[in-house]
Amino acid sequence: MLRTILGSKIHRATVTQADLDYVGSVTIDADLVHAAGLIEGEKVAIVDITNGARLETYVIVGDAGTGNICINGAAAHLINPGDLVIIMSYLQATDAEAKAYEPKIVHVDADNRIVALGNDLAEALPGSGLLTSRSI
């Protein structure tokens, strides 16, 4: 049996652009793509923290160092520039693989610059004002 588990996430990124007239996908700064271990064409889920929208699309690798997170195509009806989002990839693994796997968590600032890398699914960075879900 295979389980679907979190492969990686880019946490609390700020959407820089949303355009209906682009071919559907999400364009992500190459630095973030590589830090999260994503590849072009990979399926990702996007959760909009600002408005609660959720969607699935695929990754297009954008220019490195830009901080760009661009929502393209029909998804631009759901997610707007300035919205905070979590971009997540998933993978399938056996029980043994799933228990040993450490996801790639990429924490970014308001300009989508990497501020921390980790593998704790529920880590709240010190000073972020966020709470860990482990303490509920």
Curated annotation (Swiss-Prot):
GO terms for cellular component: cytosol. GO terms for biological process: alanine biosynthetic process; pantothenate biosynthetic process. Binds 1 pyruvoyl group covalently per subunit. One of its GO terms (molecular function) is aspartate 1-decarboxylase activity. Coiled coil: none annotated. Disulfide bonds: none annotated. Its cofactor is pyruvate. It is an enzyme of class 4 (lyase). The active site is at S25 (schiff-base intermediate with substrate), Y58 (proton donor). Is synthesized initially as an inactive proenzyme, which is activated by self-cleavage at a specific serine bond to produce a beta-subunit with a hydroxyl group at its C-terminus and an alpha-subunit with a pyruvoyl group at its N-terminus. The keyword Cytoplasm applies. Pathway: Cofactor biosynthesis; (R)-pantothenate biosynthesis; beta-alanine from L-aspartate: step 1/1. The modification Pyruvic acid (Ser) is found at S25. It is found in: Cytoplasm. Gene3D superfamilies: 2.40.40.20. Substrate binds at T57, G73, A74, A75. It catalyses: L-aspartate + H(+) = beta-alanine + CO2. Keywords: Autocatalytic cleavage, Cytoplasm, Decarboxylase, Lyase, Pantothenate biosynthesis, Pyruvate, Schiff base, Zymogen. Its EC number is 4.1.1.11. Pfam families: Asp_decarbox. Catalyzes the pyruvoyl-dependent decarboxylation of aspartate to produce beta-alanine. Heterooctamer of four alpha and four beta subunits. NCBIfam families: panD. Belongs to the PanD family. This is Aspartate 1-decarboxylase.
